[in-house]
A protein has these predicted regions:
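Hydrophobic transmembrane alpha-helices
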Residues: 5-7, 37-41, 46-115
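Membrane-water interface of transmembrane alpha-helices
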Residues: 9-23
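Juxtamembrane helix-capping/reentrant segments at transmembrane boundaries
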Residues: 23-41, 185-188
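Phosphoinositide-dependent membrane-docking surfaces
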Residues: 46, 159, 436-445, 450-469
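Soluble catalytic domains of membrane acyltransferases
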Residues: 122, 126-130, 137-306, 341, ...
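Cys/His-rich short segments
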Residues: 326-376
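Anionic N-terminal interaction surfaces
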Residues: 374-435
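Acidic, Ser/Thr- and proline-rich intrinsically disordered linker/docking segments
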Residues: 455-513
Length: 513
């Protein structure tokens, strides 16, 4: 029992130093950063106490209990204690100055504090997540770090980063010597694993389909407590590797917090696990910590947006090569129309590195950097170029089919699909006759020949691609979610909605003038 308790305590103490300190363990005389969270918020030298317990247990196992074992154990602990008091603490006081003296005044040496501030507690799950990131993710993806000197020495501050894949929080969070509270979308909390990991770090969800005042207050409260908060200003992961627009509401929230901003740029994260891919790929990632944006440079919202964009987005996306035997797996959900004939839902995966259009028969070879070529030409194009090409005339071909409802004057339907389920927070409708239609004026939910619900584009505040092949709209603070069939492509619906909404806003503006 003594050995197990001692081992657990010593390992936990070392992990805290490796994560939040400078990585120099107990007998170092050149400490540059001390740890004041977890066990170190309760006593200045937890490793000493756990070491004493451990070595006493070892002596008991090999010699059994007697008085000389007890005195030997106390003697070893006394030597270690004298080293801590006369050498290490003295050097730390001289090296770290007033900050360490304040720490000494607040944290005892001879006993443990049982009550500490909430922001000084470090959970087991938080340590587990960090350890997974360091031992597995950093090693597997060979993460390279740049600009670590830009990480602030003092809290609080806000981290903003481009968002390219599920692993983004690991790819930079493991290098920041503070516990980070991540602001995530509420959808991430739908899986048991992500809920376990995220709640363990104190992260919290923010709803995108309405103003989430509770989450906003939570974020502001954490900042006021001196914690580090990370928010992804795009509001979601990139689909094709190109950056998403920065949300104005997020910018205003960041500006309201009035703390320094640490921008982070991730290069290569999209390639190792694209949003459309069910499988991860082996590749290299570079994490770049950019210069801090001070509070005094945040007064103008447009200038703040420009600074954040400049730091977290690349001027030109260059796709890094990855290792994968099935690089095309899931790619039909990205390339939702043929580059040549523009037929929708026609791209099929034929092998791990090839695609084919079922309509015109064109075959495409996909390289390890996601570039595409045909047998008839050596010129390659990126998936981003492919998407831009099929978006160019996307509104020129409205649907020519019978719909289960009557179109309004000047209304043109562009997309229609049967759906598996429709739900809000209070309502669930699930049958085989549901259909979803997107026109240049509205989104319509129908059942056989009956129009069930209709939402004007003017009233829709947000359209999102969700998990498990679903899309959602936000209307009046209510989220309406539509589960699509497996063959339907969410990116296609997002693209059409964005373009139709843009046309609708432009026409509405012209009519007002």
């Amino acid at each position: 029992m003594f050995i197990l308790i001692g081992l657990y305590g010593m390992m936990s103490s070392d992990l805290l130093i490796l994560r939040f300190g400078d990585g120099k363990l107990h007998f170092s005389t050149k400490t540059t950063r001390f740890v004041d969270v977890g066990f170190y918020a309760r006593t200045r030298h937890p490793f000493f106490w756990f070491f004493s317990i451990y070595q006493y247990g070892i002596l008991l196992v090999f010699t059994g209990f007697n008085w000389w074992v007890l005195f030997l154990s106390l003697g070893i602990s006394l030597i270690y204690l004298l080293w801590l008091l006369l050498v290490q603490e003295s050097l730390a006081s001289r090296t770290l100055g007033p900050s360490y003296l304040r720490y000494k005044n607040n944290v005892p040496f001879w006993y443990w504090k049982f009550r500490v501030a909430e922001n000084l507690k470090i959970s087991f799950r938080s340590q587990l997540v960090w350890l997974i990131g360091m031992l597995i993710i950093r090693t597997w993806y060979g993460v390279k770090v740049e600009g670590a000197e830009n990480i602030p020495q003092n809290k609080p501050f806000i981290i903003v980063s481009n968002h390219e894949c599920y692993l983004d929080p690991f790819l930079f969070g493991i290098f920041v010597p503070y516990e980070i509270k991540f602001v995530t979308t509420a959808d991430v909390f739908t899986t048991h694993l992500m809920r376990f990991l995220l709640k363990g770090t104190g992260s919290f969800p923010m709803r995108r389909h309405r103003q989430d005042l509770k989450s906003i207050r939570t974020m502001i409260r954490m900042i006021n407590k001196g914690q580090v908060v990370c928010i992804f200003p795009e509001g979601g992961r990139s689909t094709d590797g190109s950056p998403l627009p920065i949300l104005k509401e997020t910018l205003k929230l960041i500006q309201h917090c009035k703390v320094p901003i640490l921008p982070v740029h991730l290069d290569g994260a999209y390639e190792i696990w694209p949003r459309w891919a069910p499988n991860r790929r082996r590749g290299k990632v570079t994490t770049s910590f950019k210069p801090l944006i001070p509070v005094e440079a945040q007064s103008d919202l447009k200038n703040l947006e420009h600074q954040i964009k400049t730091h977290i987005f690349a001027e030109e996306k260059i796709f890094r090569p990855v290792k994968s035997k099935a690089i095309t797996r899931g790619m039909e959900h990205l390339l939702w129309a043929c580059y040549k004939c523009h037929t929708r839902n026609s791209i099929e995966v034929t092998t791990g590195h090839s695609l084919k259009c079922s309509n015109c028969g064109t075959e495409w070879q996909v390289a390890n950097d996601y570039s595409l070529t045909t047998s008839s030409t050596s010129q390659s194009l990126s998936s981003t170029q492919w998407i831009k090409q099929i978006e160019a005339d996307v509104l020129d071909y409205p649907l020519n089919r019978e719909l289960p409802f009557t179109l309004e004057k000047d209304e043109k339907a562009h997309l229609h699909t049967p759906i598996v389920r429709y739900n809000t927070e209070e309502t669930v409708v699930e049958n085989g006759d549901l259909g979803l239609t997107l026109s240049n004026q509205r989104v319509v939910l129908s059942d056989k020949q009956t129009l069930l619900y209709s939402w004007s584009l003017a009233n829709i505040t947000i359209f999102t691609m969700d998990y498990f092949n679903a899309v959602s709209i936000g209307v009046g603070g209510v989220r309406h979610s539509f589960k699509l069939p497996p063959h339907e492509i969410t990116l296609k619906w997002q693209t059409y909605f964005d373009m139709l909404m843009g046309e609708y806003v432009k026409n509405d503006h012209n009519s007002v003038q």
